[in-house]
Amino acid sequence: MELTIKEKVLKLLSNYPEGILQSSIYRALKVSKSRVSEVLKDLEALGLIVRVRVGNQYVVKSRVQVGDVLKGRVVRLGIVWSSEYPFIAPFIKLLKDRLGFEVRVTVYTNAITATSALVRNEVDLALTPLITQLYAYSLTKSLRILGGGVYGGSAVMVDKSSGTDEVLCSEFSTMDLCRLLAVNDGFIDSSTTKYFSNPLTDLLPNIRYRRFKYVVVWHPLTEYLRMHNYEYVVSCSDLGIRYCCTLASTTAIDTDLRSKISEVYQVALEEYSRDPSKWVEWYSVLVGISPDLIVKSISEYKLQPYIDLGLIRETFSKARLGIPDISSLLGAFEFR
């Protein structure tokens, strides 16, 4: 795919860390002076470049100082397999239109693997459970949370005919937090928990043969369990969970660019809210979940674009999570 003029300008500037004459840009790119001037104004407004007057000429410098991961103007976004994130479609579109980034998406099977990839700089951005991100921040300080997302779609489900007392859920995730809240509130009468890592290989093929009494899962896994005679006990949102996955960034991306990505993300969520169905087909192909289930998920998940520390404190308090103290995690939230 041919680069846009903005992308060509940014790529050219990346080769000249000390700056380049504005007059050299249109000559190098063989683009008209007026078009280059227009593009530079846009990039300057976005804070991606700075122009310094030297005599009767301008020297143009890139202000984007990021880790090696973004040198190719490519952002790597990690998500967990779910029907939760159709809103990444407008986010990806706006990252290209406004900041000149192509986006490559990697779909992970669980929260730990996806968040670990962010900490190790294998991805630059990740939509993973807030609880997982907070503990990763506590251990490494190498990520920052840029914005909210959606909540809902997950539930505690029960097989009343099961002869076991076991609970099954994903580890160190929103489901794990939901399980704990359900135990605290008396919805689950078992303390024996088993974890699955990959829902596609560990849960779906085996649920017919090993009957766990309780399973805590997200959409569309809830639909699959209903087909196998599991019933709803309580939704995770009714237990007080108001954030599932939130957007986090590696600290290899500098603060200024993180701020711009956060702003683009909020605009993307707003655009998504106006017509969620517009993005169903694209997202269905990405994650391999049928369009019908993605359409259903739109009513299952509710937007929660901004970070509300009060809601987060309330959930931690209700879950009786005191290690680490929530106050020590506030540095993870960069833009609220």
Region roles according to the model:
Residues 52-67:
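Short, Lys/Arg-rich nucleic-acid/phosphate-binding segment
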Residues 34, 105-116, 129-131, 191-208:
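Short helix-initiation/N-cap motifs at beta->coil->alpha
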Residues 109-111, 121-134, 139, 199-200, ...:
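Beta->alpha turn/N-cap motifs
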Residues 196-283:
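Pocket-lining segment of extracytoplasmic ligand-binding domains
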Residues 175-198, 262-301:
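Ligand-binding clefts/hinges and TM-proximal coupling segments of bilobed small-molecule sensing domains
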